[in-house]
Regions:
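Hydrophobic alpha-helical transmembrane segments of membrane proteins
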Residues: 1-95, 104-239
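Catalytic domains of carbohydrate-active enzymes that cleave complex glycans
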Residues: 100-101
Length: 239
């Protein structure tokens, strides 16, 4: 009853998305809140410890930006979100032609993109606050803090956009929830491998930092354009 009341102010795809998110809040929001608490408390605690002991552990945490690429990869909502969308909504709705029209696809995509970013932001935002507070307590350079904050925002945008966009462009799931698209599997493997490699790099040079940010932003723009052209043809059920 509460679900219907809170979603009743919305209509169309926004209503459908609101009902989906409410009915699956245990799957999504409980996980996000759990990570959010850890993400905020841990850096603040390290900042306090660093200030009291003189051991600047926060500098060791903030400095190696590469490891954060892997951390955000681990905690972000990725396939668990798109698979839930397919199993609970799209597997049934894709039978209808009106649901696969370009306008309908774009509407549902941007509504879901907002939800994806909000869920990932629910983890990243407390982390950013925790890092800023912990960093200031332990006198970490402002430049180092800002570089990490920008990277965290970029990564949050990337993981929110990439998996949802690939889902719409490729729709990789069969009715049995198995992945049938080799391109989808290869792209996910590449991202995992890249994150793993970056974790080994203790100090990311500025040129690489800027390159990563630029590539992510360009990728998002290109993926939006490709999704608009391809999704009406590819966003369908697979046998």
């Amino acid at each position: 009853m509460h679900e219907r009341k809170s979603a009743s102010k919305k209509s169309g795809y926004a209503y459908l998305d609101a009902m989906f998110m409410q009915r699956h809040r245990k799957l999504f929001f409980k996980r996000a809140v759990r990570f959010a608490i850890i993400a905020f408390v841990l850096p603040v605690a390290l900042g306090i410890f660093s200030k009291l002991t003189g051991k600047n552990l926060m500098a060791d945490l903030i400095g190696p930006i590469g490891i954060w690429i892997f951390i955000i990869y681990v905690v972000a909502f990725k396939e668990n979100y798109t698979k839930a969308l397919f199993n609970n909504i799209d597997k049934y709705m894709l039978c209808y032609k009106w649901y696969r029209r370009p306008g309908a696809i774009l509407s549902s995509y941007f509504i879901r993109l907002k939800s994806s970013f909000l869920m990932n932001g629910l983890i990243t935002l407390p982390l950013i606050f925790g890092i800023v507070i912990g960093g200031m307590l332990s006198s970490v350079r402002i430049k180092s803090i800002l570089l990490l904050v920008v990277m965290l925002v970029i990564l949050t945008l990337f993981y929110s956009v990439h998996y949802l966009t690939m889902y719409y462009m490729l729709q990789p799931y069969t009715d049995q929830s198995k992945i049938k698209s080799p391109i989808y599997s290869i792209s996910n493997t590449f991202i995992y491998a890249f994150s793993l490699v970056m974790m080994q790099i203790k100090s990311v040079p500025m040129w690489l930092y800027l390159l990563i940010c630029a590539v992510v932003l360009i990728y998002m723009l290109v993926s939006f354009s490709m999704m608009k052209r391809l999704a009406p043809k590819t966003f369908k059920r697979k046998e």
